[in-house]
Amino acid sequence: SDAFGITGFDQVFTAQYRQNGADIAAYVARQESAAAAQTTAEAVRDFYLEYGGTSLDGPEAVAVIDILDTIEVVLHQGRYVIGVHEAPDRETALALVERIRNRLQEIGDDGS
């Protein structure tokens, strides 16, 4: 089924984290190729913007969106789409995304 109500965004692994006293959902979805991951990450970003989200400043190639008083973060790394769903603030969301990116690199799976 489609994750977070986003058509075509499926086969998504989600996990709950407790970060800075808040419960946050993070996700990873492996795609066929880096190009497919980029397209999917852009579709996720566009979904939140279409439904009233506001883009915030973030690191290069990382979408940070404020929507309904929560923060969404989405990016692609190789064949992976990585994101954080409904974080309480930008800093917490970006810190969790960075943990996931680092973990993928540690295990030798950079998504390529």
Task: Please describe what each predicted stretch is.
Residues 1-112:
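Soluble, non-membrane globular domain cores that form compact, hydrophobic packing
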